[in-house]
């Protein structure tokens, strides 16, 4: 059986009410992105960065998975190991929708990482304050998020899975961070979902949905069915 990859970005979680640093309102407007999302910013003012991620966890607690998260979870349940679910998002909305084995390329907001033993543990939506590593009891901790100027270890998993992928589906990402057009070119067939037209990106894909993911996801699910039957989308 052929393999499918769904790679998602901020456009997947935006309908749930989660803002990104590309939005001009909400949580991000109060911060300079490079001060709170870069390795340099963390070295200069770790408290400011950790407070920022506390605020993001609090925001995450107040939103819910949307129809697209739930549909992807259903697709993963149906296709199992033949569907790779990869996301640039750091939220837990796919998991809360019931999706298994999600690969988070840029880290996971509910988790902290121990700088002493490198252990990773989940704190849910709680604040960073007074936490200690359950493994080594160290309080030398940080958010488990890949910041600007840092390497993303999960990219190795992404590229390994891409070489096993026949149908590549890009959802809600502009290609500004990852070269999704290049990824599409590596696979037999490809589907793009974006909210606004982008001719430079669209030229790499076989099928394009320029619309909200909520309205596109059921069509994409049908495309997957067709691809698994006869190799077309």
From Swiss-Prot:
Keyword field: Cytoplasm, Metal-binding, NAD, Transferase, Zinc
Matches recorded under InterPro entries: DHS-like_NAD/FAD-binding_dom, NAD-dep_sirtuin_deacylases, Sirtuin, Sirtuin_cat_small_dom_sf, Sirtuin_class_III, Ssirtuin_cat_dom
UniProt entry tagged with the keyword Lipid metabolism: no
Catalytic residues (UniProt): 106 (proton acceptor)
The protein's Enzyme Commission number: 2.3.1.286
Principal subcellular localisation of the protein: cytoplasm
Textual note on the cofactor: Binds 1 zinc ion per subunit.
HAMAP family from the UniProt entry: Sirtuin_ClassIII
Function: NAD-dependent lysine deacetylase and desuccinylase that specifically removes acetyl and succinyl groups on target proteins. Modulates the activities of several proteins which are inactive in their acylated form.
Protein name per Swiss-Prot or TrEMBL: NAD-dependent protein deacylase
Gene: cobB
